[in-house]
Structure formats: structure tokens, C-alpha cells
Amino acid sequence: MKYIGAHVSASGGVENAVLRAVEIGANAFALFTKNQRQWKALALKADTIEKFKRFCKAHQFSPEHILPHDSYLINLGNPEAENLAKSREAFIDEMERANQLGLKLLNFHPSAHLNKISESECLARIAESINIAVDKVPNVIAVIENTAGQGSNLGYRFEHLAEIIDQVEDKNRVGVCLDTCHLFSAGYDISSLESCEQTFSEFERTVGFQYLRGMHLNGSKTPLGSRVDRHHTLREGTIGTDFCKFIMQDDRFDNIPLILETIQPEIWTEEIKFLRTLAK
């Protein structure tokens, strides 16, 4: 079964994200559990946690189909010791918040080496950061998102993801989220059914579908291999819609959250319906 939703606002309390997902006809969703542009946040209140869990149960949202995203400030491979420690502390807090809400996943952008350390050193720091976090917080899987490869950001090659995973001690506590806009911008062609098969076969060989814990379904405003991250709606932009058909008709993408981060929230309901029409 396909679980489709969007990254909805948690404004006014994380429990409201559940209701906003219901409004757009979703059976999966993503959210921030705190302000994504601040390092610190007030602790989740007991009544907020209770409402979130109650609303999820009432509307049949399973923890496996909810994909919280961490703060954009966090850089788990930061070359500077002080900033690395700050990022690790913030990531552990994000994991604790997810665990408090009964969630099983935490999506994050891997890192940027800032041209101060090598790619391998940066990837090793990311893996070490995951090891530290999962040792401190139970239950939650660290879900690495592929990137478009802007600037010194890593994670734009499948090999980067594999190198991180290889150095994570508990393989049950690490996973991957593939963003279709990022894939295309990084040079992985998904503009036809044939190119999708080639790209996802390469993913299987390099990383493995057993690690795929979610996807972000986005169009792109930039051409193949641009290394620029600019999301578009599903049916506009440079990729086309064959990738949507491929994903919706392939059971390797069953039972994971398929999350829209497209640029017009007002058409998310329509985009979710469109995706469902493509299913077998």
C-alpha cells in the first residue's frame, strides 16, 4: 500500500500537523517538531504529546508513516569541534522529541564539509554523530536524506549514503530518504520509466532498498545535474511525471511515507489524488 502525504505545518502545536494532514487527504505526513531555524526550543508538554498520539490513533496514522525533519541548522559532519558538538546536541534533542511523540524516524540532511576537511572525514563524522545519537536515544531511526549537492553539501551520491551507513554500528538504526528533486539535480535521471529503472537499480546495488525509509516527491525547477535545489510542483518543471508513475506502480516503495514538499501547498490535495490515480 502507498502512504502519501506532505510536509505540513505544526504551527500552534505538533498535534495540529495531524489535522492538517487529514485535511489534504493524506495517510502519511512530515513535520518539524520545533522551529527548524532555531537551535533550542521549549520541551514538548505532556498534553501536547498526549494529543498528538491521540489524534494519530484516531486518524490511523502509523509511526512508520510519519517523517519528522530536524532543524536545517544541524551539520553532523561539521569540521569545527564547537559547532559539531552543538549540532550533535541539537540532533539528540530532535531524536528525543521524536521518541516522546512515539515516532520511529528522524529525517536529516547529511552535512557540508565547508571545504575544511575531506569528503571521507566529513562522512565519517556524520556516521559517528549517528552512532552517538542512537546510543543515547532508543527507538528512533536516523534517516539520511540525499542532497542536490549544492556548495560543499555531501549526500548527493549514493556512494556517500553507503559510506555513512557502512560506518554506523547498528544498521537497524539508520535509513535513507530519497528526494526526487535532489536526485535529478544531483545528476540521477528519473525523467522516464527506463531511466527510473536504471537509477533505482543503481540505488539497490549501492545502498539497498532495505534502507529506504521514506521519499520526498518533488518536481524540479532546474535541469538534470544542475546541483541546485529548487523544488517545483509534481506536474511542472524539468523532470516530468514518469517518476511518479514508476514509484506508484513499484511495490519497493510500499509502506513508507511518500511526502510532498512541492511549492504550492494549496494543491497538495490535488497532487495526492493525482498520485493515487497512477497506482496499479
Curated annotation (Swiss-Prot):
One BP term from GO: base-excision repair
SMART domains (UniProt xref): AP2Ec (SM00518)
Presence of keyword Cytoplasm: no
Superkingdom as given in the UniProt entry: Bacteria
Gene Ontology MF terms in the entry: deoxyribonuclease IV (phage-T4-induced) activity; DNA binding; DNA-(apurinic or apyrimidinic site) endonuclease activity; phosphoric diester hydrolase activity; zinc ion binding
Listed cofactors: Zn(2+)
Coiled coil stretches, renumbered: none
Residues that hold Zn(2+) 3 according to the record: 182, 229, 231
Binding site for Zn(2+) 1: 69, 109, 145
Record-linked Gene3D superfamilies: Divalent-metal-dependent TIM barrel enzymes (3.20.20.150)
HAMAP family, per database record: Nfo
Family: Belongs to the AP endonuclease 2 family.
The protein's name in its UniProt record: Probable endonuclease 4
